[in-house]
């Protein structure tokens, strides 16, 4: 690929994007490197590290945008360049790559919220706190107990079903890469989905994040395809809508991201992004309808606001614990009234604060009090923040560090990826624990200790594949590169994942499963079709056909004649 020259008319945009990106990365380094080292930040150190990091970040981004990323673009296929991409062959290959870890963890991983979901199934009392679609999927597999007589086999059915569905989604994502970028990009995508360790771990894990990530990635990959090629068949449009709806049903905070995304699409009114607004509005509407139908069918109770209040809860708890002398008695009394904890146990309750996990604090929020007096508590949160801005900042950074910075050590108290089955399938039904085979016990223990517990902190190369911050920084660089090149429709498409990342920062803990949808997005964020020149625009939807299509010759040929 030859040396590229950039037009003058985009120089201001490129300069602004470069400076903005450098400022963001420098600030993240200045703040988060301190949190990674000692858990607190200092203004003087922050300013010093920002001034040091800004020019370095600007130089690195300039090299990436001018020399590295353009060379990673794929040449478009020609008609004679190999056979068409085989979706079902890719499905089989990806599925077979997930079998070994499934056998090691047989009948699969049933942790995270699995116990709560099985308890809902056993009691018949459902709640929208957990995704109803995923709970009903587990119920479907457990319903085979009458035939199989073993919950172990029911769990294996769930794992195999999820592995098949995720393999199908990943194969369709690679097919979209083949059509919109190149078959070589699709083959690299297949290798990525086959061999990346996280895919193997989550394919047989009973968590909503597996199918959610696969469906969200498929939805976005098909949006990228239409943005690049300007066309998409009716069948693939239907698949795109279904994937988007299922993703929204699996995670309610994606609905918030969709709402913000649609607002941006309406405000920008970019011609090339009209299909995004149309498809996004359809997915958003259908997801709301399906959520209401599922809740009505199962008579599910309402959800909770505790998850959304994770960050404010830990910020005030940290302020009470570490800066109580700055607070007034009135503020302390108001803060105590937020939590369903006895007065004599209140001090011990604040001592349970964990900087990396919000569960010990937000689980004790008095939801009725918060709902009825939300204006007072909002004013309390603001007033405490005015006197403790440093405490608030450190509380947020400690909680969100894995999503903001390529950390040296995985500091989170919870495991990076939870494995094992435990009593999740049997305890809610009053049955004895499963008797699982132990033929792969040594391998399972080694994986738990060296990979899944700490995100491979002690494994030299693999640790960077598991590092959440590396993935987020790489995705951020690709978003900036799209803006640097002036690919407006691509930037708008990427914005959906950016908004989901923002909602993700408000969560109670950062584990590997929260990284997973962003990890799945890497192939189509990084795979870009090669342009003939740096100024060539993306192929637009409903491209204007030349007279050659109608009259048997091009305009230039007829003018020559």
Where on the chain are the PLM-derived regions?
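Short acidic/glycine- and proline-prone juxtamembrane loop motifs at membrane-interface regions
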Residues: 204-212, 250
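Extracytoplasmic catalytic/substrate-binding loops of multi-pass membrane glycan-assembly enzymes
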Residues: 105-117, 125-141, 148-153
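Membrane-proximal stem/loop segments at transmembrane-domain junctions that anchor or position
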Residues: 302-438
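Transmembrane-helix motifs of polytopic, lipid-linked glycan transferases
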Residues: 59, 160-180
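Membrane-interface alpha helices of multi-pass inner-membrane proteins
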Residues: 237-251, 262-263, 283-287
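Loop-to-helix entry region of an early transmembrane alpha helix in multi-pass inner-membrane enzymes
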Residues: 132-136, 147-168, 190
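Membrane-interface anchor segments at the N-terminal boundary of transmembrane helices
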Residues: 153-157, 394, 398-493, 497
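Short helix- or helix-capping micro-motifs
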Residues: 94, 186-197, 244-248
């Amino acid at each position: 690929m030859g040396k590229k020259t950039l037009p003058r008319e985009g120089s201001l945009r490129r300069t602004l994007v470069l400076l903005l990106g450098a400022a963001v990365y420098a600030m993240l380094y200045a703040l988060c490197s301190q949190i990674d080292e000692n858990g607190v930040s200092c203004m003087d150190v922050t300013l010093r590290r920002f001034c040091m990091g800004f020019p370095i970040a600007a130089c690195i981004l300039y090299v990436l945008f001018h020399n590295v990323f353009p060379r990673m673009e794929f040449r478009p296929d020609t008609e004679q360049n190999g056979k068409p991409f085989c979706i079902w062959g890719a499905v089989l290959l990806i599925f077979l790559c997930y079998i070994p870890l499934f056998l090691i963890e047989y009948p699969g991983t049933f942790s995270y919220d699995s116990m709560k979901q099985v308890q809902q199934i056993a009691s018949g009392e459902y709640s929208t706190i957990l995704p109803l679609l995923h709970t009903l999927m587990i119920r479907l597999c457990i319903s085979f107990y009458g035939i199989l007589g073993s919950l172990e086999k029911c769990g294996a059915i769930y794992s195999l079903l999820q592995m098949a569905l995720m393999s199908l989604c990943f194969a369709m994502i690679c097919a979209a890469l083949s059509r919109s970028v190149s078959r070589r990009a699709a083959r690299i995508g297949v290798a990525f989905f086959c061999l990346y360790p996280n895919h193997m771990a989550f394919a047989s894990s009973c968590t909503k994040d597996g199918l959610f990530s696969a469906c969200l990635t498929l939805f976005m990959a098909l949006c990228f395809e239409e943005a690049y090629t300007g066309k998409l068949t009716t069948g693939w449009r239907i698949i795109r809508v279904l994937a988007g709806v299922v993703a929204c049903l699996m995670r309610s905070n994606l609905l918030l991201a969709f709402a913000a995304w649609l607002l941006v699409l309406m405000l920008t009114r970019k011609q090339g992004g009209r299909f995004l607004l149309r498809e996004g509005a359809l997915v958003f509407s259908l997801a709301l309808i399906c959520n209401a139908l599922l809740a009505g069918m199962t008579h599910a109770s309402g959800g909770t606001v505790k998850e959304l209040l994770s960050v404010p809860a830990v910020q005030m708890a940290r302020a009470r614990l570490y800066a109580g002398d700055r607070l007034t008695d009135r503020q302390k009394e108001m803060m105590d009234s937020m939590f369903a904890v006895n007065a004599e146990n209140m001090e011990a309750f604040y001592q349970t604060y964990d900087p990396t996990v919000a569960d010990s604090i937000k689980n004790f929020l008095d939801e009725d009090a918060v709902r009825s007096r939300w204006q007072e508590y909002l004013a309390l949160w603001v007033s405490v923040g005015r006197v403790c801005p440093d405490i608030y900042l450190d509380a947020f950074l400690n909680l969100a560090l894995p999503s903001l910075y390529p950390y040296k050590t995985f500091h989170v108290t919870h495991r990076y990826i939870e494995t094992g089955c435990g009593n999740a399938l049997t305890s809610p039904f009053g049955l004895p624990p499963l008797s699982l085979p132990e033929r792969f016990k040594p391998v399972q223990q080694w994986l738990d200790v060296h990979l899944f517990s700490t995100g491979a902190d002690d494994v030299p190369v693999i640790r960077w594949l598991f590092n959440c911050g590396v993935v987020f920084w790489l995705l951020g660089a690709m978003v900036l590169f799209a803006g640097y090149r002036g690919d407006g429709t691509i930037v708008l498409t990427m914005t959906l994942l950016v908004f989901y990342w923002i909602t993700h920062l408000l969560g109670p803990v950062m584990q590997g499963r929260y990284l997973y949808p962003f990890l799945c997005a890497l192939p189509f964020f990084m795979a870009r079709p090669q342009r003939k020149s740096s100024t060539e625009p993306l192929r637009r939807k409903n491209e204007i056909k030349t007279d050659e299509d109608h009259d048997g010759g091009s305009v230039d040929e007829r003018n020559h004649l």
